[in-house]
Every structure is written in C-alpha cells, then in structure tokens.
C-alpha cells in the first residue's frame, strides 16, 4: 500500500476511530440458507461494466463442474456469430465461476449472447452497449436488500424492474446479502433480481459490511463483481473501488467499510481512496457524476455516525460538486445536502445530493442528528419504508424518484444544469 501523508481533513479523528472500532456491528448467528446446488447449465449470468461500456462488456457466470468457458455473441440485427474464450475465476458454494470480456463492440448497438462450453449453453440474452458520449438513459438505485430476501425484499426488487423496464443499469449500494459467504443467500439475491435482469443490464455494485467476514471480503464478490480494473493501487480494494463511464455519467464505487480494513489500517484504506477519488474527479470528461458507497456521509439512523467518512471524503465530494451520492447501511430513507448549499428558495439548493435508502425489510429508526453534526440538513426522511429509486438522465437534467413497491412516489427532485448553473429542486 502506498504511503500517504496524514490528511488535514481527518484532524482529531483518533478518538472517533477507536470508538468506531469498538462499536463495529457484529453479525449474530442464526439459521440461514445453505449452499445452493449449481446447475450443469450455466446460471447466475450477470453483466458487469468495463471502464468503456460503449465498446466492451464483461459477463460472469457459474456451473457445477469445471469446463472450458466460452461466450458466443452476435449483433442482434444479424450477421455471423463470434465465439471467444472466457477464464475460470474460482469456486464458491459448490460452483465453478467464469468471466469473459467482449471487446471491439460498436457503441449503441444491441448484441445477443450466450455462455457455456461449446456444447452446453445458457439461453440467449440481449444487451445494448452504451452510446459513445452523452445520451438519455435511466438507471435504478437499490439500497440494502440483505435480509429476508425472498419474502421481504424480492417483491420490491421485482416492482423496480417492472417499473423501470427500460433501465440501462442498476446501482447496488451494498449489503446485497446478510452473510458474506452464504451461497443460499446469493441464490436468493439472483432470484430476486431475475435471470433476464441480471444478464441483460449492467450491475454496478459496491460492497457493504455484510459482504465481509472480519477482514475478508466475501469469496463470492470478485466472482460476481470483478470491477473494472481502474481503482486505487491497493490489492485490498480490488473490485470494490472503480469507475465506469456511461453515456455522460461517471459512476464511481468507493469502499467505505473501514472497520473491515486489514489490521484496522483505516488511514491507508480511506486516504488511498481519497487520493484516487480526487484524481478520478479532476480528470472527468462527463457532465454528470454519481458516487456510491455503503456507509453514509451523514448517518440516517439512531446510534450511528458518519464522522469518519466525512473526515476523508466530504470535502472532495463537495469540491468537485458530485451530483449524487448513493448510500445504504442505515435501514431507513434520507435525502439532504449541506446547509451551506441552501439558496433563498427553500425548495432549491446547490451542491451534491446525499441519499440513504433501504430496499429490504430490515428497518432502523431515522434521526437527523448526524446530518446536523455534519453541517447538513435533511429534506426527506422516512422510517419503515422499503424503496427503489429511478434516475433519468437527459441532457442538462437529472430526475430522481424514490418509490415504494406499489409505485407511490415518496421523494423526488430534479437537478438542472442549464441556464445560470446547477440547481437542485424538490419535487415532493
């Protein structure tokens, strides 16, 4: 890990870090699903982004027994098919996993593909490459799915995909499962997302604390979500801190699980990403920026604090005027901004929008106290509310809606970058 000088943004954090380590959440044992038997036919087919999704696409999958992995693909409009070799990436939960990256693709083009070994194949799936530059699209943002996935979370997830059937990708803000290496829970997650949704759109995922067991990231994580390979020069952050550019939006994943840093080396963990984030934001050709990580900048529930994340990352997010910061962890809904970014109109502010959401049924009691300690204000805050979020990007406007499973809009705003500068206007 590169040596990074102490951050002036992290002054007086020592006591807070000791407290954070002492209060780090423990996962208590209880009955959980076991390994799900992997099928001979390829399953858990998942699209994950590359750095350049206009011309390339990564796909991951698994089977029961080790085979010679292949991907066959062709333009959906017709023409000869191409078969390329994949790579065997590891084993977990009774299955062998594979990955392949298709390159030399044409922008804004539909492709059909299937994965297999040349004899046994998956069904055919379709994906569309990104446009080579800004173009309108929508995406989904899901908070913690984590608990009671099949009965409690899946109905909300399915409602999201039914409502946003034209979404180009999904952002997952961590805690996809409750027990990091429980294959049965991963099976439930894939079932909730659905085969076609997993295999036909990109999934930008950032890990939560429940994707860790102590200092160890889930063995499933790199097999499903390898990242784009452009993150910090730190092996402990591989596949968890990365970025991808999609039609005028730079999506950035950070790993905020500092209490899971090896040997509790919190300073290097957070500062390596701080330095990397500054570089990625300073050299950003896109008009829009979305950052996702699990633990919030401003904690949204009782008994929690975002002070460590604020010390390292808040100034960078504000300096580069990131548009959306999409988070999870607190099992409640909250949306707000720095008080310093208020305007004369109470329904309008400037600067980044910070959101915390939860898709699964586990709930905590929301509070505004940590927002206030961090110099921020809450504009919408909800408890006992499972939501999904649809974000539409079109030219100078970004429109955001948070909805419950029955389609009720519980929060909405629009970011407008036309005219005299950026304005964030409440719509609910």
Where are these regions (language model features)?
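Bacterial N-terminal signal peptides that target proteins for export
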Residues: 4-19
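Extended active-site neighborhood of metal-dependent phosphoesterases/phosphodiesterases
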Residues: 99-102, 110-131, 184-285, 312, ...
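Acidic/histidine-rich helix-loop elements
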Residues: 78-97, 140-155, 180, 229-233, ...
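Acidic, histidine-bearing metal-coordination/catalytic regions of metal-dependent phosphoesterases
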Residues: 2-3, 19-21, 27-141, 162-163, ...
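Short acidic, glycine-rich surface-loop motifs adjacent to enzyme active sites
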Residues: 177, 258, 284-301
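Non-catalytic positions within long, well-ordered alpha-helices that form the structural scaffold/packing
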Residues: 161-163, 282, 318
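Conserved, compact domain cores that house catalytic/ligand-binding motifs in diverse enzymes
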Residues: 137-206, 211-212
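Active-site neighborhood of phospho(di)ester-bond hydrolases with catalytic His/Asp-centered motifs
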Residues: 141-143, 169-175, 203-209, 254, ...
């Amino acid at each position: 890990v590169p040596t990074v000088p102490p951050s002036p943004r992290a002054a007086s954090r020592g006591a807070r870090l000791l407290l954070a380590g002492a209060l780090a959440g423990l996962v208590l044992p209880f009955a959980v699903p076991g390994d799900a038997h992997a099928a001979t036919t390829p399953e858990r087919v998942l699209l994950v982004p590359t750095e350049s999704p206009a011309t390339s696409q990564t796909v991951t999958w698994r089977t029961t027994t080790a085979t010679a992995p292949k991907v066959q693909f062709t333009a959906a409009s017709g023409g000869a098919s191409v078969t390329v070799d994949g790579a065997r990436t590891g084993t977990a939960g009774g299955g062998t996993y594979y990955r392949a990256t298709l390159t030399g693709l044409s922008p804004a083009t539909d492709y059909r593909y299937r994965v297999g070994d040349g004899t046994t194949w998956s069904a055919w799936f379709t994906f569309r490459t990104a446009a080579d530059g800004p173009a309108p699209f929508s995406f989904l943002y899901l908070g913690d799915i984590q608990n009671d996935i099949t009965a409690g979370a899946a109905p909300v997830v399915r409602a999201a995909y039914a409502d946003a059937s034209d979404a180009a990708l999904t952002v997952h803000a961590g805690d996809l499962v409750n027990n990091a290496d429980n294959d049965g829970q991963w099976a439930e997650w894939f079932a909730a997302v659905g085969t076609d949704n997993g295999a036909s759109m990109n999934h930008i995922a950032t890990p939560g604390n429940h994707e860790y067991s102590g200092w160890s990231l889930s063995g499933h994580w790199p097999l499903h979500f390898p990242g784009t390979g452009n993150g910090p020069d730190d092996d402990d952050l591989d596949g968890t801190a990365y970025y991808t550019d999609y039609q005028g939006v730079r999506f950035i994943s950070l790993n905020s699980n500092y209490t899971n840093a090896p040997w509790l080396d919190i300073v290097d963990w957070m500062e390596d990403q701080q330095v990397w984030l500054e570089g990625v934001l300073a050299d950003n050709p896109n008009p829009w920026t979305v950052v996702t990580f699990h633990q919030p900048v401003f904690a949204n529930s009782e008994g929690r604090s975002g002070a460590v994340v604020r010390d390292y990352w808040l100034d960078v997010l504000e300096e580069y005027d990131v548009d959306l910061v999409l988070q999870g962890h607190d099992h409640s809904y909250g949306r707000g901004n720095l008080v310093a970014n208020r305007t004369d109109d109470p329904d309008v502010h400037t600067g980044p929008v910070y959101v915390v959401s939860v898709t699964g049924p586990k709930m905590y009691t929301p509070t505004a106290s940590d927002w206030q300690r961090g110099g921020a204000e809450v504009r919408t805050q909800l408890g006992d509310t499972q939501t999904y979020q649809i974000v539409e990007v079109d030219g100078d406007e970004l429109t955001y809606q948070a909805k419950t499973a029955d389609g009720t809009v519980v929060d909405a705003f629009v970011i407008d970058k036309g005219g005299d500068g950026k304005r964030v206007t409440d719509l609910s």
